[in-house]
Curated annotation (Swiss-Prot):
Entry keywords, A to Z: Cytoplasm, Exonuclease, Hydrolase, Nuclease
Subunit structure: Heterooligomer composed of large and small subunits.
Protein name: Exodeoxyribonuclease 7 large subunit
EC nos: 3.1.11.6
Role description: Bidirectionally degrades single-stranded DNA into large acid-insoluble oligonucleotides, which are then degraded further into small acid-soluble oligonucleotides.
Gene Ontology biological process terms from the UniProt entry: DNA catabolic process
UniProt keyword Isomerase, yes or no: no
The keyword Nuclease belongs to this UniProt entry's keyword annotation: yes
MF terms (GO), sorted A to Z: exodeoxyribonuclease VII activity; nucleic acid binding
Family, similarity comment: Belongs to the XseA family.
Cross-referenced HAMAP family: Exonuc_7_L (MF_00378)
A Pfam family: Exonuc_VII_L
InterPro entries for this protein: Exonuc_VII_L (IPR003753), Exonuc_VII_lsu_C (IPR020579), OB-fold_nuc-bd_dom (IPR025824)
Organism, scientific name: Escherichia coli (strain SE11)
Amino acid sequence: MLPSQSPAIFTVSRLNQTVRLLLEHEMGQVWISGEISNFTQPASGHWYFTLKDDTAQVRCAMFRNSNRRVTFRPQHGQQVLVRANITLYEPRGDYQIIVESMQPAGEGLLQQKYEQLKAKLQAEGLFDQQYKKPLPSPAHCVGVITSKTGAALHDILHVLKRRDPSLPVIIYPTAVQGDDAPGQIVRAIELANQRNECDVLIVGRGGGSLEDLWSFNDERVARAIFASRIPVVSAVGHETDVTIADFVADLRAPTPSAAAEVVSRNQQELLRQVQSTRQRLEMAMDYYLANRTRRFTQIHHRLQQQHPQLRLARQQTMLERLQKRMSFALENQLKRTGQQQQRLTQRLNQQNPQPKIHRAQTRIQQLEYRLAEILRAQLSATRERFGNAVTHLEAVSPLSTLARGYSVTTATDGNVLKKVKQVKAGEMLTTRLEDGWIESEVKNIQPVKKSRKKVH
């Protein structure tokens, strides 16, 4: 008897297609660890090999577009970790996997751990920009957390000595590789924060493999960097090496040398600042002197146009006050300049650029001497012009006119007499001579007749 419902009947092609779709849709991408065997690479550039363990094996294919991203040459017997899609080769019904990426087994497992920790810390917000602390500018003391025998420490110290030899450096030596390294790095970061001697920390090491750099992918190290009150610059490996510490740090430097560049100031730049300050000082002094000279010239011109002795005295008092203010301002300017020079000299002495400092001091002495000479010359010229102005004013004074035999006669109302018609007989007059006054009475008035010229 036939059953009530006939079972589905597959062709071989349909069966293989159905199995392939089930494998691809249900399994998706998987990670597989195994040993390589039967590795071949035909002219097409694709890789064909078998992955096996102690009890089973599976055929694998890795096409050229994928295998060219692999950084090593697979070898027979090598343990690898692959990311692949499971499929079925329909023409032969062979079950196989299509490999998308491949890593040595050890590095592959570490890479998985790296990605998992990165995702975890990122979800907690440890990488957020809002938590990044600004670096001090300039840094007054730098702490270095690295191996005391590694090339990274040598590179950092070399750059700091070249750029800013006066910058203090405190080294917190620690292991940077091995099982004990993460704990030592954490303790060094905590110690630096407890002692609070530095205002920036460089945490890092030289280049190496993923295993060599793994201490800086440790969760304990990442959380210690995040918790540090002192800004941290990560400097792990080479520019292509990126660790968890780089994401958590306040700033990532591609190399230890680059980290030293970031936290230090350039000595040559400091020297350029000194030269620029000196030039601005010279310009300010020249402008100040020119402005005061112009002001003095204006005052002197006004004095020449105004005669009374009282005004002259007031102008002289104002001039003296201006001179005192100018002297006081110049003294303060020189004092501030001297203080700034002393600070810069102390800074430069610590950096030991003695020849340039000596030349700068010589130049400043010359400028001080030149300023003193200019002030003496200006004051001497001012006194001479003032004396000439007084002599000129005395020469045109009415008192000088009286001394030459002239007199001034005024009526009883105080008006100066210029014509005879201003007085009458019997009026009293007052005459001013050089040495006193004469009072007189008008007896007779005799006008002088003006002669008329004939016109031809």
